[in-house]
From Swiss-Prot:
This is Gonadotropin subunit beta-1. InterPro entries: Cystine-knot_cytokine, Glyco_hormone_CN, Gonadotropin_bsu, Gonadotropin_bsu_CS. Glycans are attached at N36. The gene is cgba. Heterodimer of an alpha and a beta chain. GO terms for cellular component: cytoplasm; extracellular space. The lineage of its organism: Eukaryota, Metazoa, Chordata, Craniata, Vertebrata. One of its GO terms (biological process) is ovulation. Belongs to the glycoprotein hormones subunit beta family. It is found in: Secreted. It comes from Coregonus autumnalis (Arctic cisco). CDD domains: GHB_like.
Length: 137
């Protein structure tokens, strides 16, 4: 009888641990999402700062301890799902200056990391996770 209850408890704990990371990811503050960012733009005739909407955040990544041909590694990168170019004029530009055309994110998604246009390096283990919010420390 005792062994049966112990076995059942082990199964419940294992099931809980299996589901926990999936549920934690859906409420993570560091997940892939739209984010406002201020950048500096310049050219010969003018320069200044603008605020754009871009994608930022962490994506789930699978990195196995062993190499396998039937279990591929996948590394997601937070990137634009839908975007468009917006015309931006800077205050410091002379009258009649050509505008800047800036890509602006409309929605974001975790997609397979494309090394031709994305930095796919791993993030340091010192990076805050969903469990620890640096603002609450």
């Amino acid at each position: 009888m005792y062994c049966t209850h112990l076995r059942m408890l082990q199964l419940v704990v294992m099931a809980t641990l299996w589901v926990t990371p999936v549920r934690a990811g859906t409420h993570c503050r560091y997940g892939c999402r739209l984010n406002n960012m201020t950048i500096t733009v310049e050219r010969e005739d003018c320069h200044g700062s603008i605020t754009i909407t871009t994608c930022a955040g962490l994506c789930e990544t699978t990195d196995l301890n062993y190499q396998s041909t039937w279990l591929p590694r996948s590394q997601g990168a937070c990137n634009f799902k839908e975007w468009s170019y917006e015309e931006v004029y800077l205050e410091g530009c002379p009258p009649g200056a050509n505008p800047f055309f800036i890509p602006v994110a409309k929605s974001c998604d975790c997609i397979k990391c494309k090394t031709d246009n994305t930095d796919c390096d791993r993030i340091s283990m010192a990076t805050p996770s969903c469990v620890v919010n640096p603002l609450e420390m």
